[in-house]
Amino acid sequence: MHAIGPYEFTDQDVERTLASTRTLFDLLPGGFPADPDGPAAPFRAIAERALDEHGDDDPDAALGIVWGEWRSAMHALREAGAYGPRADGLVAALHLGSGGVPKHPAAEVEVTWSGVVGDRQASRQHHGRPWQALCLWSSEVIDEFAAAGHPIGPGLAGENVTVSALPWDRVVPGAQLRIGEVRCEVSSYSLPCRKNARWFTDGRFDVMHHRHGPVSRVYATVLEPGTIRVGDPAILEPDA
């Protein structure tokens, strides 16, 4: 096990995080195509150099640098105003499961550095890293898909937290949220999986890919653990 502060990485987590480094920077505001003069640019350069120089022979060292520079890039973007003003919403639903989808509703969940207590993924190949501790989705997006005829509902696609009344186009990598007692930072979009095909007409699960606009689920890193209850406030950029 590899640790960075409170975050624990398995060997597979290290490998997959390093393999995702460029994509994680691409997903940040101004990340693709990369803005050479943007707030994140100097941090990306250091992370990519560490990846090139140490990724194969000293992955622990590469991970430490990549993690630090990635988090610093998000901080720099926040300082530059990339994530906008505070917005207030609510926790509409909570979900956890023993693996796979759908997840099952809960009135309250306890969240640690590694995610929701009692929740697990059927496979960790594409899930379960510290920056994928929580999966969030918008009740308004779900409702729009349902209104279009897709048999989708909260928790069916595997999100832990369904929020309402937040501007989902601003819930992007690097944005921070206070959800109940938990503070988290959006890390990436959750790519659609064919296991979710049953929730979409003709199996067209790709419609929730972020390439189609602000419709994707998102992953988040836990910054402050705690309890979340249905009906709790969900605040985007709470310090703005």
Identify what each model region corresponds to:
Residues A197-R198, D232:
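Short, charged, solvent-exposed linker or helix-capping segments at domain edges/interfaces
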Residues H150-N160, T201-S216:
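Short, basic/aromatic beta-hairpin or loop at an interaction surface
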Residues H2-R16, T21, D26-E48, A61-I179, ...:
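Electropositive, beta-rich accessory/interaction domains or terminal extensions
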Residues R217-A240:
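Well-ordered alpha/beta subsegment
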Residues E53-G55:
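Amphipathic alpha-helical coiled-coil segments
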Residues W168-D169, H210, G231:
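Short amphipathic alpha-helical patches
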